[in-house]
Amino acid sequence: MKAILPFAVMCVGMFVALLDIQIVASSLQDIGGGLSAAQDQISWVQTSYLIAEIIVIPLSGWLTRVFSTRWLFTGSAVGFTLASMLCGLAWNIDSMILFRALQGLLGASMIPTVFTSSFHYFQGNKRVYAAAVIGTIASIAPTLGPVIGGYITDAFNWHWLFYINLLPGTLVAIFVAILVKIDEPDVSLLKEADYPGIFLMAIGLGTLEYFLEEGTRWNWFSDNTITACAWISGVSLLAFIIRSMIVKNPVVDFRAFGNRNFALGCFLSFTTGIGIFSTIYLTPLFLGYVRGLSAWQTGVAIFSTGAASIAGVPVYIALARKYDLRWIMMFGLACFGLAMWSFSFITSDWGGDQLLWPQIIRGFPQVFCVAPSVTLGLGSLAPARLKYASGLFNMMRNLGGAVGIAVCGAMLNARTNFHFAALAGHLNAGNGAMTGLLRGLTGRLSRGLGSPVAGHQAALRELWRMTYAQAQTLAYSDAFRAIMLAFVIATCLVPLMRKVTPARAAPADAH
């Protein structure tokens, strides 16, 4: 009980922080309308949070050594809660963007800290349970975000997307301060910190996240700002990596990549991030833009993914106690790839009923993808490197999500145009099916509008809309196939990892 209670409290904090990544995803239009924001400003409600979060996550190992797990987590929970309150009180879009950045900045440390704490609180086979809990939270929280966000916005208003964090955030801060006693702070590390390295990393990751999040909207390298961000990110991150390899006390230890399991684990975490976040991005987008469903209807339609994720947890625990984690992870990755293949048969008529089984196949194996990667990727590292490595490991999952969403967004634009041009080429007088459809639409709409000319024009618009919807649907199918390919590659790489046997006891200096 001494281990379970503090770990459970920290998991609540991690869940809330991960939930807030996607809780606004289905309600951005409501937030933008409430704050009188322009269309090109609304996405910054999401982007500002992600930029701030991805900067802090790799620093969490160093921050834990400076302030201790107890006080870093407590401070993160307090800061996250206060920033959530400010988000709810935001008076315009600029204040909302600032407060969302603070929310991501202050709450980011709660995520990787839980990963390292699990290795302190649990040894031997008990780590299977801890990894299962972490894997479930890491996969289900972003999935439930749009569902919960859509319900709250429809039932109350968008302000409550942030106010719901106040009670759990306060309780987490109080109980972590009381219960968590893992290590002691060492503020002397502040004197020896590599501040130039921190600056390079912040600039590099911040501009990289902006490049990935905003590139599609601004047509990538045709925009000067996007091009500048790409160059700044590349140069800054290269300089940061080189500096981290030569300074005495780096804030991020890249030497952990010399461990085969950790390097492969990071790649698999990256791929899992692509799958989880990209599908969360694609499915609501399809239901909203192609099917025209509301935020709440979209949430209901994708709820089966979250339910299936929870159902997979006890199955994973039972299997993980008996079988090699590598084969379990291969099963999870292969099932996720199979789900993406089933999604590729999507049509413009698909709704909750048609999405049910593909989403169950996608949701059930999520814990099989995430939980083994924690044990296999981090479990083979020396205790002294574990804290630093956890930040990198978590950053790779978030970075995978950012890359996946960016690539899928670019694919949707490019492939929609490609498919529309291909379909439009068949819309001519020689196509009997098309002319029959147009004739029927014209007759029906003419009767409603009272004019053959108006009816014909309305029929042409409807034909264009139907064609564009089909082109969009084919583009979504292409995006799901691309994700499937990433999971096929990841599945093939798992056997290269070494088997990890859970330790029976934690070293005294592990944290």
Region locations from a protein language model:
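Small-residue-rich segments within alpha-helical transmembrane domains of MFS-like 12-TM solute carriers
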Residues: Q22, G88, G104-P112, A141-T143, ...
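Transmembrane core module of solute transporters
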Residues: K2-G61, R65-R70, S84, S95-M96, ...
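Hydrophobic transmembrane architecture of multi-pass small-molecule transporters
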Residues: S27, Q41, L171, N398-I489, ...
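Hydrophobic alpha-helical segments of secondary membrane carriers
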Residues: V133-I137, L268, L392-M396
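Cytoplasmic loop-to-transmembrane helix junctions
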Residues: Q41, K126-V133, R385-L392, A475
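Small-residue-rich alpha-helical segments with characteristic i,i+4
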Residues: A141-P146, L355-G440
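C-terminal membrane-cytosol helix-exit motif in multi-pass small-molecule transporters
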Residues: L166-P185, A202-E214, I232-I246, T491-R498
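Helix-loop-helix hairpins in multi-pass membrane proteins, especially solute transporters
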Residues: S26, I57-I198, E214, D223
